[in-house]
Regions:
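ATP-binding N-terminal substructure of ATP-dependent carboxylate-amine bond-forming enzymes
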Residues: 1-129, 148
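Short secondary-structure boundary segments
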Residues: 94-95, 165-166, 200
């Protein structure tokens, strides 16, 4: 288990969330302006909600289908405050919104999900630790904090396995399949040469 999990559970994220629901006509603040934010905004509009996007990019896909956009870095507290003042509830398009921004917004408006959930989802070791702690079956896994640790992790788990970057990998990026003949130094480089996780390969019939 990685040492980060106890910190997650005791991080003390506070929020302005009384558990209330929001009727059509409310404004949903979406952190992130990509394709997922665009789909969220379009679905929300069909249900009668308005959306306000916060994104560092001026012409993001989500901002093209919403009436309001705040264009600013995720660490701009003045812009975050103006954004919070303009919306009723905040959600996140993707998991890699900085912790500090999520926590800042949660002190001003309800957030869905809560910041600690975002914190867990941002890092694969935290995800696996959290799921294991709560009794959810996961494949065998080991942290790979440095290149030298990869050899021992492969020895313990054995190929086939998947080496993944702990953060920011998606759609197959930052992932390398480890077979018996894989050059581990090359695999480490292709993964990104950063904190990683080695997961035993799962023989599954389908993904639902």
């Amino acid at each position: 288990m990685s040492p980060a999990l106890p910190e997650v559970m005791t991080a003390g994220f506070t929020g302005a969330d009384g558990g209330q629901s929001f009727a059509p006509g409310a404004t949903i603040g979406i952190m992130g302006g990509g394709q997922l934010g665009r789909m969220t905004a379009l679905a929300a509009a069909r249900l009668g909600y308005r959306c306000h996007v916060y994104c560092p990019d001026a012409d993001s896909p989500a901002s093209q289908v919403t009436s309001a956009t705040t264009v600013a870095p995720y660490d701009d507290e003045d812009a975050l405050k103006r954004f919070a003042d303009a919306v009723d509830v905040v959600t996140f398009e993707f998991e890699n919104i900085p912790d500090s921004a999520a926590a800042f917004l949660a002190t001003r408006k309800p957030t869905r999900p809560k910041p600690f959930v975002l914190h867990i989802c941002q890092q694969r070791l935290r995800e696996k630790d959290f799921l294991s702690l709560n009794g959810v079956p996961v494949t065998k896994y080991l942290p790979v904090p440095e290149r030298e640790a990869l050899d021992e992790a492969v020895r313990r788990l054995g190929p086939p396995a998947i080496l993944k970057s702990a953060q920011f990998g998606y759609d197959g990026k930052g992932q390398v399949r480890i077979a018996t003949d894989t050059d581990l130094a090359d695999a480490w480089r292709r993964m990104g040469g950063t904190l990683g996780i080695l997961e035993a390969e799962v023989d599954f019939a389908l993904e639902a």
